[in-house]
From Swiss-Prot:
Acts on short-chain (C4-C6) fatty acid esters and triglycerides, including tertiary alcohol esters. Activity on p-nitrophenyl esters is generally higher than on o-nitrophenyl esters. Lacks beta-lactamase activity; it hydrolyzes the ester bond of cephalosporin substrates but there is no opening of the beta-lactam ring observed. Optimum pH is 7.0. The gene is estB. One of its GO terms (cellular component) is cytoplasm. This is Esterase EstB. It comes from Burkholderia gladioli (Pseudomonas marginata). The keyword Transmembrane does not apply. The active site is at S75 (acyl-ester intermediate). It comes from the Bacteria. It is found in: Cytoplasm. Its EC number is 3.1.1.-. It is an enzyme of class 3 (hydrolase). Optimum temperature is 43 degrees Celsius. Strongly inhibited by eserin, NaF, HgCl2, SDS and Triton X-100.
Amino acid sequence: MTAASLDPTAFSLDAASLAARLDAVFDQALRERRLVGAVAIVARHGEILYRRAQGLADREAGRPMREDTLFRLASVTKPIVALAVLRLVARGELALDAPVTRWLPEFRPRLADGSEPLVTIHHLLTHTSGLGYWLLEGAGSVYDRLGISDGIDLRDFDLDENLRRLASAPLSFAPGSGWQYSLALDVLGAVVERATGQPLAAAVDALVAQPLGMRDCGFVSAEPERFAVPYHDGQPEPVRMRDGIEVPLPEGHGAAVRFAPSRVFEPGAYPSGGAGMYGSADDVLRALEAIRANPGFLPETLADAARRDQAGVGAETRGPGWGFGYLSAVLDDPAAAGTPQHAGTLQWGGVYGHSWFVDRALGLSVLLLTNTAYEGMSGPLTIALRDAVYAR
């Protein structure tokens, strides 16, 4: 399915027909045991057309998924923390072109030749700094030897120590000369803490969660009974996760992820700005709607810049046709991407089994939070859900 036949001025969504299509998609995924449970929301121009919980939050206990179930957000954290950064930019407390050393004077990563390049807030927001991720490199890599955390696993050191280790790894390229998914939002989390004088959780709450009415999100929770139990893909059915499990990523996505489901309940776990938040589907939708509509949340010029491709289509951040802005991947060429979404669509996901997109041309915000990695992030379910939304 491509975008060629979808005229934004003629596009319409009937809630009953949409629900029938989406329910069929979830019924098939559950029947085939590719999915344990999910919460999905589709909104158009701020009106919720579909919001349903599917399957089980805890398969072994038989606990059903609820619309207010809490999820470990993984990289769905990133756009929320990026919004906090942009709010500080709007206030003049941060600057996009300023070096990160203005707030983190000790963070001075070098290139392979030993030279120290300028790394800016812009580079970090767009993942063009040259930093990387253990999950991309895997066992035996420099990131592995240095013991750098991705913010998904549980370590016995703090954020400052992780950034010290990260700064000692050579950059993959000169800042601004390439694109690579990275720990940049963890670095920006530390920048937010220094700029505000607050812990990251408090700063994100004040800058983003409270203004948007996100009441069920944070970094450390004391309500384990509200959480979806995480699972990973397996045969004949998904496998319940345990701390320390290493799950290979799908081909083309990287090496593997080291999960620690208990991290979200550990008060001593450092706040990962790239992967450490939890939240409900309603909370995440509020953030997506702020990104889509920007109801005075950011100055319009800054919101436009955040939603515009800053990395270039050559970055292929989700494959051909995709660039990257300050919040997520940005669709430049729907035909090259082979998608019915429109140019300017923003999209990303999370390794615990999440995906979302915002098609601003159609006023669409579409969210899928699941407890099944990686089916809910990049599996057939995500394509089937997308195509069901655009089906005519």
